[in-house]
Amino acid sequence: MAGHSKWANTKHRKAAQDAKRGKIFTKIIRELVTAARLGGGDPGANPRLRAAIDKALSNNMTRDTLNRAIARGVGGDEDNNMETIIYEGYGPGGTAVMVECLSDNRNRTVSEVRHAFTKTGGNLGTDGSVSYLFTKKGVISYAPGLEEDAVMDAALEAGADDIVVYDDGAIDVFTAWESLGAVKDALDATGLVAEGAEVSLIPSTKAELDAETAPKLLRLIDMLEDSDDVQEVYHNGEISDEVAATL
């Protein structure tokens, strides 16, 4: 299955991610603690925890750090009042945007999220306003350079749902989100080395952005990700190579 450039992937990743490494680690640790608190410390029986572990390792977090976070969650000593909140809204260019948060203060979080939407010309929606456009999936990503047929055969044998090969040669393998850990283990066993693995919300439709709306969407994502309460931002915006070259 052919795909567009990685620039137009489901989630925008900042090029200067290293500058936000500390904040990224803080958010991953918060998710590890919460997942372990809610579902226990065994990743084999806790898909949410397994997904958080895969994400932590993809971001080069040490085993010691993630194990301490899991122990905190199982012990129930910290972050025991954190709750997952999903906000939905419309961004620039009619894009559908989903914002996944972990928060101990709903009023603070919704205020920050609403402010980001308002400042970039979007608006915060009600529950169900755009969520029907997204499906929760596991995503295992591979860097360019692998043989497409080899990845496809291994992925299908492992129980994957779909494979997308992008113009730059990168490959994403999609799974049921609950099966992410098992499928990744099976692919690892074949010798394929994944660049990353995570649970994501995949849009069923795309909204094409132009030179005016694309920068506004990227600003919205930046503002949302700057919030300590925001864990993930998903959207259905698509930026063509031509528009991307002007940014």
From Swiss-Prot:
Belongs to the TACO1 family. GO terms for molecular function: DNA binding. It is found in: Cytoplasm. Gene3D superfamilies: 1.10.10.200, 3.30.70.980. GO terms for biological process: regulation of DNA-templated transcription. This is Probable transcriptional regulatory protein YE2395. Pfam families: TACO1_YebC_N (PF20772), Transcrip_reg (PF01709). It comes from the Bacteria. NCBIfam families: PRK00110.1, PRK12378.1, YebC/PmpR family DNA-binding transcriptional regulator. InterPro entries: Integrase-like_N (IPR017856), TACO1_YebC-like_2nd/3rd_dom (IPR048300), TACO1_YebC_N (IPR049083), Transcrip_reg_TACO1-like (IPR002876), Transcrip_reg_TACO1-like_dom3 (IPR026564), YebC-like (IPR029072). Keywords: Cytoplasm, DNA-binding, Transcription, Transcription regulation. One of its GO terms (cellular component) is cytosol.
